[in-house]
Amino acid sequence: NIPLLTLVDVPGFLPGVEQEHGGIIRSGAKLLYAYSEATVPRVCVVIRKAYGGAYIVMDSMGLGADKLFAWPSAEIAVMGAEGAVDVIHRKELKDSDNPEELKQKFVDEYNDKFSNPDIAAKLGLVDKIIKPSETRKVVTEAFKELVNKTNVGDKHGNIPL
């Protein structure tokens, strides 16, 4: 019956054969399973990067976090701006006379449109954007609100091994 506090700064799962052979999928599945089966109060604070599937596994709203807060510095998106711009605007960058300047323009646009915490809050993916100095107070209040969270009793699932 110990509540869970998750501080998120995850740049995503690194793609590659080495990570796959190292068991990243299995490890991610185990963490996903543990969070989804947890019946204790769960509070999550995104402090910096929260990208893609790795963020989802780190107790996102989609996974059922009871409360989710984000610092103003949080970046919540499918992937980082640089990587997204390389994929989305590959042709324009290749054909540009000044690719660095154009890339920076696209990165700034991506950050404004997709990866800032205000967008996540508007979409209901974040309960509140908080200042770093407020974190202790806000988290404490959240756990006080959740003190009577009903325990659903024993659950028996099939953990991914």
Residue map of PLM features:
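Ligand-binding clefts of soluble mixed alpha/beta catalytic domains
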Residues: 1-161
